[in-house]
């Protein structure tokens, strides 16, 4: 009988090392299609950058539109925000108050003043008129202002739903905070790490605001069937090995599930994801419908006073 020896573990035969049960599943990152820099589109004296829509990117279904106002400083005795009474139909608006405040009033009887760190979510549905202006205190005293407004589409079945509004001050928004304090996530709708958002979306949209300190890192898993909305409000981040900075929107492919985020400096990111509606979108002015005929009807209804008035 010849000499017998035992192979060290590291030299086990390949058919043992590569057994089906020995593989470790490595999550694959979503690939990035393109980085879009916002276009500068001032409104009177209001600093405004618009990353969506642009000539290169029409929508991230169902995310339709984003305006980033500021940051800027208003002097005392200013005119404040210029968004007086105007109508909407067929969509929703989500307003992020990073700094400053905003007074909301609409023909559905809703009225509020939301301050720094707060959120407003309005469902226009079948139609209403609203105004978004600065508070009297802000106009008198001035101060820092930075506000973003995101438009969300509504599917055909909900275009004519009942209008609704809900405002949240910063302290009212559920939040996830990491153990080391480097990550704070305001969960607006949907769920994040067991924290349920403050708003119940009609269309299962997830929306959150990520506040990241320099050096913080975060990994998320988002199903491939959901489109991702990712916009850098402040600072610099590296997402799936690609750098992105303030005023940039990251467009993803729907190929994998993992989102890995690292902050190069203190940063704020708006993160959303949703299943696309895959419906025709006809947007004209403040109305978002499925056909030109529906747009014409919206204008006619508004002119006939069917949206109400202040």
Predicted regions and their residues:
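Jelly-roll (double-stranded beta-helix
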Residues: 2-310
């Amino acid at each position: 009988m010849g000499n017998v020896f035992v192979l060290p573990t590291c030299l086990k035969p390949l058919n043992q090392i590569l057994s089906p049960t020995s593989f470790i599943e490595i999550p694959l990152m979503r690939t990035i299609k393109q980085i879009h820099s916002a276009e500068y589109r001032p409104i009177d004296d209001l600093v405004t950058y618009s990353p969506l829509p642009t000539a290169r990117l029409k929508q991230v279904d169902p995310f339709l539109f984003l305006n980033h106002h500021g940051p800027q400083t208003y002097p005392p005795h200013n005119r404040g925000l210029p968004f007086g009474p105007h109508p909407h139909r067929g969509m929703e608006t989500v307003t992020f108050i990073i700094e400053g405040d905003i007074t909301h009033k609409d023909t559905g009887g809703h009225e509020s003043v939301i301050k720094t760190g707060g959120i407003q979510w309005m469902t226009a549905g079948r139609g209403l008129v609203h105004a978004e202006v600065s508070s009297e205190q802000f106009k008198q005293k001035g101060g820092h202002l930075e506000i973003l407004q995101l438009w969300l589409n509504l599917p055909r079945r909900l275009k004519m739903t009942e209008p609704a509004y809900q405002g949240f001050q910063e302290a009212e928004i559920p939040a996830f905070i990491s153990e080391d304090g480097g990550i704070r996530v305001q969960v607006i709708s949907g769920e994040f790490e067991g924290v349920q958002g403050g708003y119940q979306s009609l269309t299962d949209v997830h929306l959150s605001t990520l506040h990241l300190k320099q050096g913080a890192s975060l990994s998320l898993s988002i199903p491939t069937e959901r489109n991702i909305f990712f916009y850098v409000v402040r600072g610099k981040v590296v997402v799936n090995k690609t750098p992105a900075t303030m005023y940039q929107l990251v467009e993803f492919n729907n190929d994998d599930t993992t989102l890995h985020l690292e902050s190069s400096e203190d940063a704020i990111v708006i993160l959303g994801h949703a299943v696309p509606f895959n419906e025709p979108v006809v947007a004209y002015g403040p109305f978002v419908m499925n056909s030109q005929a529906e747009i014409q009807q919206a204008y006619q209804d508004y002119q006939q006073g069917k949206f109400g008035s202040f």
